[in-house]
């Protein structure tokens, strides 16, 4: 087997697959793509059927199933931290919501020294490059990219339309495209689903077009033990296949690209000798490079479910009954349509809860059934819910390797809800959600409040609900942040500070979490850096306009 390549990519996820596909477009370039999980089995409905999105989170075949340390502000709960395992990474198990973030997220990134070319108008062309939207291209959307994006259709569930209308009746804007000119407001939510109703993971979109190339070698069930160095230069990796304890060395002529995600990327750097000296000494790992920011600055989105009974039989509750599922599965399998062909997150929104925020600080996902994201605690009646959570928490956490063993999970602490702002935002969000649900558009459907219940009113009661019931939105990020400050890990091209031949390219390099779901932005990051690595000029800056609230009131 070949043991030397131009590039070695660690992690076949949302970023790694983009890089594998783009780098091998150049003739003669060789890439080794290592993935600790298995293939993305195309006949496994658990990962391929959009409506089955909860199933991969319930086991360990496709999910690393990380768990946090006891979270001190969350009743000391050990909280779930699911990450994708298999070709596609977290794009193989995520909720398929295609949300890019707010334009001002990127403009604020670009205000940091060294990140000036990460403004919204710089990154929008790369969002477009990656995308094929089912209703065609425009100034904001692409028409010939590897990622299939489906838009909601007018004949979808009536509850989606009612919930958007209720948000507008409550005084918030309406937007026809959460990824277009104006993110702020309520409207339809795009999703990464193919025209045939299949999950559009990066394995399907990018690897499928790259697999026939002679320059790409993919190894699944390959756990990277450590990065190999010659001085300060990364020269390869040592990895294990399957359950074997005997490792394999592979060498990189050009670069090693770490794309293992916001949990595993810092853990791998630490095990390889790149990180804070005190931590490495505790692990008995020889220091290669002192870089204290590795594993710091960890961020996530937290959310709660506000659930209501539905007084008309229009929710998806019947789809949860086993006797209805064979017909749903058959329609999806043979026609690519029906309930199974949607993730059922087809409406949502972004709002500002207070005038002090320059762009939305709260996100909504609307779901026409009452159930936890991971499929647990389904309410046994017709219902609907709003997933609501804050977007740019001031809380910061960390990821620490626990040992040199590559198969041992790291220590993860998000420090959820560690600031007064966190608590105020959730109180505001729950109360505003109740106002929205109380609007006339939902009068025909609104039953009793199931969770947290109408009796939960005071600040103390709302705080107790959040402490005991809030869950991750599965958006860990920022743990190898790009920038130039003392705690930055990489520069604006993903190159690890103080090292040669080593980059980190995934959600961990975001300097600050974005306003929305992470998958689309992670793909964009990889597309943008791939052009730099290939010596290509950046795509021309967009001239598209975008909404800035300015002095506009929170509610119209």
Swiss-Prot record:
Annotated EC: 1.1.99.1, 1.2.1.8
Q: Which UniProt keywords apply?
A: FAD, Flavoprotein, NAD, Oxidoreductase
Give binding positions for FAD: 6-35
Return the SUPFAM superfamilies for the record.
FAD-linked reductases, C-terminal domain, FAD/NAD(P)-binding domain
**MF terms (GO), sorted A to Z:** betaine-aldehyde dehydrogenase (NAD+) activity; choline dehydrogenase activity; flavin adenine dinucleotide binding
Going by the record, the broad EC class of this enzyme is oxidoreductase
Domain of life the protein comes from: Bacteria
| One Pfam family cited in the UniProt record for this chain | GMC_oxred_C
Which reaction(s) does the protein catalyse, per the Swiss-Prot or TrEMBL entry? choline + A = betaine aldehyde + AH2; betaine aldehyde + NAD(+) + H2O = glycine betaine + NADH + 2 H(+)
One GO BP annotation here? glycine betaine biosynthetic process from choline
Recorded metabolic or biological pathway in which this protein acts: Amine and polyamine biosynthesis; betaine biosynthesis via choline pathway; betaine aldehyde from choline (cytochrome c reductase route): step 1/1
Cellular component terms per the entry's GO annotation: membrane
**InterPro entries to which the protein is assigned, alphabetical:** BetA, FAD/NAD-bd_sf, GMC_OxRdtase, GMC_OxRdtase_N, GMC_OxRtase_C
Give the residues annotated as active site: 475
Q: Which cofactor does it need?
A: FAD
Q: What NCBIfam families does the annotation carry?
A: betA, PRK02106.1
Q: What does this protein do?
A: Involved in the biosynthesis of the osmoprotectant glycine betaine. Catalyzes the oxidation of choline to betaine aldehyde and betaine aldehyde to glycine betaine at the same rate.
Family that this chain belongs to: Belongs to the GMC oxidoreductase family.
* Matching HAMAP family: Choline_dehydrogen (MF_00750)
Name of the protein: Oxygen-dependent choline dehydrogenase
Question: What is the species listed in this Swiss-Prot or TrEMBL entry?
Answer: Xanthomonas euvesicatoria pv. vesicatoria (strain 85-10) (Xanthomonas campestris pv. vesicatoria)
């Amino acid at each position: 087997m070949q043991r030397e390549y131009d590039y070695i990519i660690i992690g076949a996820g949302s970023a790694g697959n983009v890089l594998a596909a783009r780098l091998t477009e150049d003739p003669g370039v060789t890439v080794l793509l290592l993935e600790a999980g298995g293939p993305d089995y195309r006949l496994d409905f658990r990962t391929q059927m959009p409506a089955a999105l909860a199933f991969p989170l319930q086991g360990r075949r496709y999910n690393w199933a990380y768990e946090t340390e006891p979270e001190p502000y969350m009743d000391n709960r050990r909280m779930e931290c699911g990450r994708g395992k298999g070709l596609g990474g977290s794009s193989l198990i995520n909720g398929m919501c295609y949300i890019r973030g707010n334009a001002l997220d990127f403009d604020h990134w670009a205000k940091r020294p060294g990140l000036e070319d990460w403004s919204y108008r710089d990154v929008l062309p790369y969002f477009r490059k990656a995308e094929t939207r089912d209703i065609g291209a425009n100034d904001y959307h692409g028409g010939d990219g590897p990622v299939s994006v489906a838009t909601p259709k007018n004949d979808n569930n009536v509850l989606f339309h009612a919930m958007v209308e209720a948000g507008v009746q409550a005084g918030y804007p309406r937007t026809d495209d959460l990824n277009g000119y104006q993110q702020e407001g309520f409207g339809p939510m795009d999703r990464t689903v193919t025209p045939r109703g299949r999950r559009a993971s990066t394995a399907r979109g990018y690897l499928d077009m790259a697999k026939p190339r002679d320059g790409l070698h993919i190894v699944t069930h390959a756990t990277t033990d450590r990065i190999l160095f010659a001085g300060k230069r990364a020269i390869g990796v040592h990895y294990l296949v399957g359950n074997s304890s005997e490792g394999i060395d592979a060498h990189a002529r050009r670069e090693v690209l770490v794309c293992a995600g916001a949990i595993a990327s810092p853990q791998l750097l630490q095990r390889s000798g790149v990180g804070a000296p005190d931590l490495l000494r505790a692990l008995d790992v020889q220091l290669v490079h002192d870089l204290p920011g590795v594993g710091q600055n960890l961020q996530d989105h937290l959310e709660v479910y506000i659930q209501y009974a539905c007084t008309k039989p229009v929710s998806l509750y019947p789809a949860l009954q086993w006797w209805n599922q064979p017909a749903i599965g058959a329609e999806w399998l043979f026609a690519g349509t029906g309930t199974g062909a949607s993730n059922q997150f087809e409406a949502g929104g972004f709002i500002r809860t207070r005038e002090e925020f320059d762009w939305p600080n709260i996100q909504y996902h609307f779901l026409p059934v009452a159930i936890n994201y991971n499929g647990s605690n389904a309410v046994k009646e017709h219902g609907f819910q709003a997933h609501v959570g804050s977007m740019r928490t001031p809380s910061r956490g960390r990821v620490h390797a626990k040992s040199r063993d590559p198969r041992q999970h790291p220590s993860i602490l998000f420090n959820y809800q560690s600031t007064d702002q966190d608590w105020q935002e959730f109180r505001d969000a729950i109360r505003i959600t109740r106002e929205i649900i109380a609007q006339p558009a939902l009068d025909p459907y609104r039953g009793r409040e199931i969770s947290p219940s109408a009796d939960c009113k005071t600040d103390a009661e709302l705080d107790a609900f959040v402490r005991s019931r809030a869950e991750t939105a599965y958006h860990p990020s920022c743990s190898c942040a790009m920038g130039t400050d003392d705690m930055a890990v990489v520069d604006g091209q993903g190159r690890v500070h103080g090292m040669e031949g080593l980059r980190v390219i995934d959600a961990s390099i975001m300097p600050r979490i974005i306003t929305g779901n992470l998958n689309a932005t992670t793909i964009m990051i990889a597309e943008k850096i791939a052009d730099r690595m290939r010596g290509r000029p950046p795509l021309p800056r967009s001239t598209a306009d975008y909404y800035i609230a300015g002095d506009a009131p929170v509610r119209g």
